[in-house]
């Protein structure tokens, strides 16, 4: 069996070890040795983009925010779905992840970060959401395991009522937010509904051949009365 190659690593703000690995042509991100995502299981990341940016609701010059760059699969799909006048902001907490995408992952998705539609913000996606009302047509959030299981405790504020209200205000009327979740979160779904979103819970497989949809994507549509 071919060994895992440790390509690069860094430390998160709380001191955890975050690393990029390659094995038999596939790439993986790990936190303290535990796999967070891999290029062999990207179905749910692509679905996240499909649900946030449905082609039938395409706008001429959409502004999209992606929370979490990861291996770049959600970004690639958003660029495929939006037109040439789109502005796609990517908020990534770790500058090293941005650098790894440029240095190691070009063979996966191409030079995504060189696309003129892409704007990279190195920092917390919460700061992007806080900067203005009715700013985004779509928001994709894949920054943690979901509303209750956190790798980074500070991400909890995105899923609490105040955070959800802030997301609602940052969307344009008719805008969508899509949250990736490792599992079902009915309490969070209710929280989105209380904030005024029309909510869909969408099952998501980790990979094409999976027998069941282990993950969930929660899609909130901003409806204005």
Task: Describe the predicted segments one by one.
Residues 42, 46-171, 179-182, 190, ...:
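The AdoMet/dcAdoMet-binding core of the Class I SAM-like
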Residues 218-225:
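C-terminal lobe and adjacent flexible extensions of AdoMet/dcAdoMet transferase-like proteins
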Residues 1-30:
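N-terminal auxiliary segments of SAM/dcSAM-dependent transferases
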């Amino acid at each position: 069996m071919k060994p895992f190659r440790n390509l690069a690593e860094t430390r998160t703000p709380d001191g955890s070890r975050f690393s990029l690995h390659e094995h038999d042509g596939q790439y993986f991100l790990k936190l303290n040795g535990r796999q967070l995502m891999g290029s062999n299981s990207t179905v749910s990341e692509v679905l996240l983009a499909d649900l946030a940016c449905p082609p039938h609701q395409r706008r001429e010059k959409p502004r999209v925010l992606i929370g979490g760059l990861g291996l770049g699969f959600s970004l690639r799909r958003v660029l495929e779905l939006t037109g040439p006048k789109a502005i796609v902001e990517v908020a990534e907490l770790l500058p090293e992840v941005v650098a790894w995408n440029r240095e190691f992952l070009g063979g996966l998705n191409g030079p995504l970060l060189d696309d003129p539609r892409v704007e990279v913000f190195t920092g917390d996606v919460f700061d992007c959401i806080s900067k203005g009302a009715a700013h985004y047509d779509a928001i994709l959030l894949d920054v943690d395991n979901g509303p209750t299981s956190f790798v980074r405790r500070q991400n909890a504020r995105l899923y609490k009522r105040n955070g959800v209200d802030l997301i609602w205000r940052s969307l344009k009327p008719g805008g969508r937010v899509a949250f990736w979740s490792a599992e079902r979160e009915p309490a969070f779904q209710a929280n989105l509904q209380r904030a005024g979103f029309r909510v869909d819970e969408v099952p998501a497989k980790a990979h094409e051949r999976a027998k069941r949809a282990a993950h969930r994507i929660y899609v909130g549509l901003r409806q204005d009365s």
